[in-house]
């Protein structure tokens, strides 16, 4: 198998450009809720022209952080508001739901995209709040589909998430695995110590971005099934 980083260090650091005012803008929600014993990530993906903006937040378990002793300054990032450290046996799905509810007061969340794993727990809670939830049955299957766009967004400097070292870390922890049959998979460089939740949440949102975040209204209406 061929392996490589999903983006160069220079490309990742270029994403740290300040995000513009996106008040009331339409966006796609992304969610990675699979690892409720360590990290969970949520986010909103916006588009303006060729540029995409990713506003994200994470939740991490206090007990996990104490035992894992990760190298990055997680507590410092928490102080900056990039993530919330919770003291509970597993990450309560209501943290995720409440975050999207709060964001809905500021932005127009068209849809929330997540993988099927553990979605049975959180989907009813999101739908009870009136959110439209789309599930991805096999996340790795969409990686190959999105790989050309992901590569282009990084290479052409069209993706931004503001000054967010946590998101940088997530992205540095991803490697692009190309299988013998040419399929692309975004995998963790280390299964236990290299978290990728924020990146995977963004990939989930990107899956629906071309359908929802478009300037071509006629095309969008054609795609809808009333």
PLM features: what roles do these ranges have?
Residues 3, 7-10, 206-226:
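Acidic two-metal-ion nuclease catalytic site recognized across multiple nuclease folds
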Residues 106-118, 123:
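Short glycine-rich phosphate-binding loop at a beta-alpha junction
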Residues 22-54:
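Gly/Thr-rich phosphate-binding beta-strand-loop-beta motif of the actin/hexokinase/Hsp70
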Residues 46-111:
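Nucleic-acid-processing active sites and adjacent nucleic-acid-binding tracks
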Residues 33, 114-117, 136:
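Short His-Asn-centered micro-motif
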């Amino acid at each position: 198998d061929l392996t490589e980083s999903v983006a160069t260090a220079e490309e990742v650091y270029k994403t740290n450009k300040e995000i513009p005012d996106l008040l009331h803008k339409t966006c796609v929600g992304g969610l990675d809720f699979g690892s409720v014993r360590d990290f969970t990530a949520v986010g909103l993906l916006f588009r303006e022209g060729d540029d995409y903006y990713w506003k994200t937040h994470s939740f991490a378990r206090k007990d996990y952080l104490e035992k894992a002793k990760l190298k990055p300054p997680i507590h410092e990032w928490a102080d900056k508001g990039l993530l919330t450290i919770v003291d509970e046996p597993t990450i309560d799905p209501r943290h995720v739901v409440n975050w999207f509810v709060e964001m809905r007061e500021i932005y127009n969340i068209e849809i929330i995209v997540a993988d099927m794993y553990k979605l049975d727990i959180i989907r009813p809670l999101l739908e009870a709040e009136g959110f439209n939830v789309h599930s991805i049955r096999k996340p790795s299957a969409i990686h190959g589909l999105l790989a050309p766009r992901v590569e282009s967004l990084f290479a052409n400097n069209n993706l931004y998430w503001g000054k967010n070292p946590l998101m940088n870390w997530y992205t540095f922890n991803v490697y692009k695995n190309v299988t013998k049959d040419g399929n692309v998979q975004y995998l963790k460089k280390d299964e236990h110590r290299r978290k990728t939740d924020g990146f995977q949440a963004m990939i989930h949102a990107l899956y629906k971005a071309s359908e929802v975040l478009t300037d071509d209204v006629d095309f969008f209406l054609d795609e809808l099934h009333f």
